[in-house]
């Protein structure tokens, strides 16, 4: 004879809050939250890098086989001024008479903070851009189809404002070599004092 099923519905067991099972479920939930947070942070970082690379790719001169460091610095300067039109439009909206509140204030703040951060990087140890100084890396970058999975194939290089100065601009009078040469010549011309 077949078994008669009871009318009791299966209820989920209530887990005691201090049990090992509750601790395990809490750990799993925290682990999943951490994974989701890291995944979203990585996606945000990749999208920012992707936008930067897309801007550089669209502003490259197609006739150039490679760029000098000075030309790369000029390209970076134009990159740092990419928001100028948008800031002008925001200023124009805010300058209209009769407006008591500033429109697009949060966007304006974000743009100014981004520009300031990138300017500090450029003036400091360098801003990271695709390696357009090397002709082979430039060709790979031009052939890139904006696929983020192929991002590791693109070589990056840090370029700072000091790279825009030519070699002759860096050799300022009074450099270390000149000072050492002057000190050496002064030592030779000094009279020797003999003790008696």
UniProtKB/Swiss-Prot annotation:
Compositionally skewed regions (Basic and acidic residues) per UniProt: 27-37
InterPro entries per UniProt: Tma16, Tma16_sf
GO biological process: ribosomal large subunit biogenesis
Keywords: Nucleus, Ribosome biogenesis
Coiled-coil features, chain-numbered ranges: none
Pfam families attached to this UniProt entry: Tma16
Subcellular location: Nucleus
GO CC, alphabetical: nucleus
UniProt KW Nucleus keyword: yes
Molecular-function GO terms, alphabetical: preribosome binding
Region called Disordered, residue ranges: 1-37, 162-196
Family recorded in the similarity comment: Belongs to the TMA16 family.
Subunit-structure text: Associates with pre-60S ribosomal particles.
Function: Involved in the biogenesis of the 60S ribosomal subunit in the nucleus.
Name the record gives this protein: Translation machinery-associated protein 16
Protein source organism: Xenopus laevis (African clawed frog)
């Amino acid at each position: 004879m077949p078994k008669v099923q009871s009318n009791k519905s299966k209820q989920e067991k209530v887990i005691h809050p201090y049990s090992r099972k509750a601790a395990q479920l809490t750990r799993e939930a925290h682990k999943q939250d951490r994974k989701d947070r890291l995944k979203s942070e990585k996606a945000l970082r990749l999208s920012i890098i992707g936008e930067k690379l897309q801007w550089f790719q669209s502003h490259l001169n197609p006739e150039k086989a490679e760029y000098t460091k000075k030309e790369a610095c000029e390209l970076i300067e134009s990159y740092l001024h990419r928001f100028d039109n948008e800031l002008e439009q925001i200023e124009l909206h805010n300058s209209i008479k009769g407006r008591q509140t500033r429109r697009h204030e949060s966007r304006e703040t974000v743009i100014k903070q981004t520009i300031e951060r990138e300017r500090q990087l450029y003036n400091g140890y360098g801003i990271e851009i695709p390696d357009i100084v090397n002709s082979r890396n430039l060709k790979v970058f031009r052939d890139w189809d904006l696929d983020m999975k192929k991002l590791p194939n693109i070589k990056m290089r840090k370029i700072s404002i000091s790279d825009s100065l030519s070699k002759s601009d860096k050799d300022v009078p009074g450099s270390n070599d000149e000072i050492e040469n002057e000190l050496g010549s002064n030592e030779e011309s000094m009279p020797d004092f003999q003790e008696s």
